């Protein structure tokens, strides 16, 4: 494991400040653990990024399948980590409260693996159908595919209404597709296939057989989940909620946490935050060449990385 020797990471500091602003005790446990794991691997990468990212060439042709486990928890830089983990905070507070910690952890683990598998299938299909072998070499890292899958779940459990994306009202059920197009249009360096893979995995859960398969695999472990400090409630839709307790027996009120979450988001919905971020990205890319790597970071092929590195040294 290689420890980073970089200077101050502004994105990481902003993420930590927002976590402490909400209060660690107010963040559901699996959401908090997911943030901690991603921050840990950012500070202590298991392998260099080029040996952690997933591509058809590396995973399938070279049988390096451990990349499926490594790629979701590695990020290109501190801003990539910041945008992904702030989005995880927003989704985790809502979904973990509704689904329960154990089921939410099960979802995170399953989605992390499946988004990588679907990404590889999409890249392989694109390479074969379009006769473009470069698709097999595109190497991606980051948690954004899982976040798009969670966004599908969030829209499924809270249907109806409209969101505003780049000034256009979009029905909530189509918000994921609009965000996919908006992010790809405004930041073309992002992994379109990685984000699309997340949406497809989310649809497999809400509209397809994935949830039933997960129910069957969980089986008796989920049905016996009533253990110390948590009260689980089950119905034909799986675990529907839980209640955590402080050590003195007082319940943790995550509903109040969700309301307080508006304080540090300035009362903006996730879509409104996305719109502001995209507009800021457009402005920033129009005024500077050295901005942070955009949301949904995708590693270019090795030759492109070498060319960019040489170009940077030539300019010094």
Curated annotation (Swiss-Prot):
Q: Which reaction does it catalyse?
A: Cleaves type-1 transmembrane domains using a catalytic dyad composed of serine and histidine that are contributed by different transmembrane domains
- Under the cellular component aspect of Gene Ontology, which terms does the record hold? endoplasmic reticulum; endoplasmic reticulum membrane; endoplasmic reticulum quality control compartment; mitochondrial membrane
Active site (UniProt)? 144 (nucleophile), 195
* VCP/p97-interacting motif (VIM), as annotated region: 301-316
**Membrane topology qualifier:** Multi-pass membrane protein
The EC number(s) attached to this protein equal 3.4.21.105
Regulation acting on activity, per entry: Inhibited by aprotinin.
Q: Which residues cross the membrane?
A: 22-42, 104-124, 138-154, 183-203
Renumbered residue ranges of the record's region Ubiquitin-binding domain (UBD): 269-284
- Extracellular compartment segments: 43-103, 155-182
Instruction: State its location(s).
Output: Endoplasmic reticulum membrane; Mitochondrion membrane
Extract the InterPro entries matched here: Peptidase_S54_rhomboid_dom, Rhomboid-like_sf
- Topological domain (Cytoplasmic) residues are 1-21, 125-137, 204-316
Q: Which UniProt keywords apply?
A: Apoptosis, Differentiation, Endoplasmic reticulum, Hydrolase, Membrane, Mitochondrion, Protease, Serine protease, Spermatogenesis, Transmembrane, Transmembrane helix
Q: What does the tissue specificity note say?
A: Expressed in intestine, lung, brain, kidney, epididymis and testis.
- The protein's name: Rhomboid-related protein 4
**Gene that encodes the chain:** Rhbdd1
